[in-house]
A protein has these predicted regions:
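Non-catalytic alpha-helical scaffolds and adjoining flexible linkers that form interface surfaces
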Residues: 1-21, 25-265
Length: 265
């Protein structure tokens, strides 16, 4: 069985002296695993960095076998993010979450398109506005991932009152939005719902990003990784830690340059 297609590199690990065991995400074949001979060597290692888009060629005698992979880089997303700690953390997170969440060999064409688009945005710009845009983009992507896996969040109306305005909470049990009025005395038991999930023009502030990561992380942990007996990926946890570091009122300005030393709802 042979095929050739654009693929997003999700992970690459050393296999033998210089070979790379890679996990790729493709439009027609979903997540696939393969062996790149010499993939960790000096000439090829940069190509197979997680987050890069490559033109991959996969060959195996049978579909269930570990394929032999070769390819050329199309888009060097990983290198573009090296100048920003947060951009690289975002890119690493979407790769790790995708790699851990999706079953091998199942087609998710729409999610592949969304993931490739998002990966191409990280590190493209710099500054506070770019940081906000990247975090909002990542959080919306995580919502799309949940939806594509069958765990859509319902943000259209309040689960208690039916109203569509002032939706500021989400039920951790049902994934349905709750208005300020509908929350009442149960507000402390609900997840804060950042406005960036409702308004495409809203990119939020660090407190919103932290709340958003907690929100999507709750459903990823419970609905996606829990049944697989897997923890939330380490790259996703690191991203949440970086965002949390932006919230401390007494912190020094963080180095994001990449140069590191029961509610009724």
């Amino acid at each position: 069985m042979n095929w050739e297609a654009p693929a997003l590199v999700l992970s690459a690990s050393l296999f033998g002296e210089a070979n790379a065991l890679v996990h790729l995400f493709t439009s027609d074949h979903g997540v696939v695993h393969g062996l790149v001979r010499g993939g960790m060597g000096r000439r090829n290692a940069a190509t197979w960095q997680p987050g890069n888009l490559v033109q991959a060629r996969w060959r195996a005698r049978l579909p269930e076998q570990l394929g032999s992979v070769s390819g050329e880089i199309i888009q060097a997303n990983a290198a573009r993010c090296l100048g920003s700690r947060l951009s690289l953390a975002c890119l690493s997170s979407i790769c790790a979450v995708t790699d851990s969440a999706l079953p091998e060999g199942e087609r998710y064409s729409g999610l592949f398109d969304d993931t490739g688009r998002v990966a191409s945005l990280f590190g493209a710009e710099s500054g506070e506005q770019a940081t906000a845009f990247e975090m909002a983009t990542l959080l919306r992507w995580e919502r799309i991932l949940l939806q594509d896996l069958g765990f859509a969040l319902n943000l259209t109306e309040c689960a208690v009152t039916g109203e569509r305005a002032d939706l500021v909470y989400l039920s951790p049990r049902t994934g349905r939005a709750v208005s300020r009025q509908g929350a009442g005395i149960w507000a402390s038991r609900l997840l804060p719902l950042p406005g960036l999930f409702l308004n495409p023009e809203d990119t939020g502030i660090p407190a919103d990003w932290s709340a958003g990561l907690r929100l999507t992380g709750h459903f990823l942990t419970r609905d996606v990784f829990g049944p697989l007996h897997r923890p939330l990926p380490a790259a996703r946890i690191r991203l949440a830690d970086i965002v949390q570091s932006l919230l401390s009122p007494h912190r020094q300005k963080p180095d994001l340059s990449g140069e590191e030393s029961g509610h009724p709802a």
